[in-house]
A protein has these predicted regions:
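Short helix-coil transition/hinge motifs at the ends and kinks of transmembrane helices
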Residues: 1, 85-89, 165-172, 274-283
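Hydrophobic, regular-secondary-structure patches
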Residues: 1-41, 62-64, 153, 168
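Alpha-helical membrane-interface segments at transmembrane helix boundaries
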Residues: 184-198, 221-222, 251, 255, ...
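Transmembrane alpha-helical interface segments in multi-pass membrane proteins
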Residues: 196, 205-272, 276, 294, ...
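Mechanotransmission and gating elements of multispan inner-membrane complexes involved in transport
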Residues: 15, 97-198
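Short cytosolic juxtamembrane segments of multi-pass membrane proteins
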Residues: 311-326
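Alpha-helical membrane-protein architecture signal
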Residues: 5, 180-190, 200, 239-243, ...
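Hydrophobic secondary-structure segments that place a key small or acidic residue at a functional site
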Residues: 24-27, 36-48, 55-130
Length: 326
């Protein structure tokens, strides 16, 4: 775990390009209700600086925010739900037993869709220091608001100033400085890996589907050789025979696309509900109309391409040979 001092907060805040900085505490806490004990995270911050709410997008669901000097708590959204933290949820103005101390609940934050954050307890830094007065307490994070036009330079300057304050050499730091863009990029990289894995599975599925469609159309042509011969004997052109079988293969692809969209939406919706039930509601599927259309069109084209060769074979059938075919 990282450990930062008040002096290091001031070092960060005095760095050129930094508008404001604040230290944040994060500890484990024991809570108790009706004789049942649980261990959760408790986060302490300076309510005079709204950086916490800005970074973690915390919005009050009911009650109020913490104010300087408060010896009370604001709870995450999960404390409002039955059978999430305890069987019976908390309500506004209830008392929570925190580290053996009775503390009043003055508010609840709206859900951020992340189980750990929605299960956290929030207090002021001063109250945090009071709750843990018997143990050494250091800031776990320093959050800063900086000039976004020169964010890379500011990040490097913060690293340089903290290294100097800690007496550490470059490359041997026991901390790191990360911008919000860096965090998004790291999450995006992990998400891209998952997406490409899913795309690979989808491409394999498309390949298998194309082969199955081609086999189906070849079988259809073989079973209808006499029918093709009859149509040609009464004047059907090669192009018309080709169009008939190409339409059939395209229609097979269209039906497969529609069914795929229906089952895909159903499974995505079910997966979203399962993910939400375990506390990660921010990971939810979206269903843009263009994606549905694109999937169905792609499936139709795949069917058409897969059926092109069997359709051509059907159009080239000799009517005399076809009528003698057994």
């Amino acid at each position: 775990a990282f450990a930062f001092s008040e002096d290091e907060v001031r070092v960060v805040e005095s760095t050129s390009g930094v508008y404001s900085a604040t230290g944040v505490y994060l500890k484990n806490a024991e809570i108790e209700k009706s004789g049942v004990k649980k261990y959760v995270s408790i986060l302490g911050y300076d309510p005079k600086k709204p950086l916490m709410s800005d970074v973690f997008t915390l919005n009050v669901y009911t009650g109020r925010e913490l104010q300087p000097g408060d010896r009370r708590v604001v709870l995450g959204y999960n404390y409002l739900l039955p059978n999430k933290i305890f069987s019976k949820p908390y309500e506004l103005n209830d008392n929570i037993i925190l580290n053996g101390r009775k503390v009043k609940v003055i508010g609840f934050y709206a859900s951020v869709g992340n189980a750990p954050d929605d299960s956290q307890i929030y207090v002021t830094n001063d109250f945090m220091e009071e709750l843990y007065s018997n143990s050494s307490l250091s800031y776990n994070w320093i959050i800063a608001k900086v000039d976004t036009k020169n964010i890379d330079r500011v990040v490097k300057d913060i690293e340089k100033n903290l290294r100097k304050e800690r007496g550490q050499d470059q490359g041997k730091e026991d901390f790191f400085v990360q911008s919000f863009d860096d965090m998004i990029e790291s999450y995006s990289t992990a998400l891209d890996i998952v997406i490409w894995f899913i795309v690979l599975i989808a491409l394999i599925s498309v390949f298998v589907s194309a082969i199955n469609t081609a086999n189906t159309m070849i079988t259809s042509v073989l079973e209808r050789v006499k029918e093709i011969g009859v149509m040609k004997s009464i004047g059907a052109k090669d192009s018309e025979i080709f169009a008939i079988f190409l339409f059939e293969s395209s229609f097979l692809g269209f039906i497969a696309g529609v069914l795929g969209v229906i089952f895909g939406v159903a499974l995505s919706f079910l997966g979203g509900k399962i993910i939400e039930s375990v506390g990660y509601g921010f990971l939810q599927p979206t269903f843009p109309a263009w994606l549905f259309i694109a999937c169905i069109v792609f499936a139709t084209l795949t069917g058409a391409i897969s059926g092109a060769l069997p359709s051509r074979s059907a159009s080239k059938v000799n009517p005399v040979d076809a009528l003698r075919y057994e």
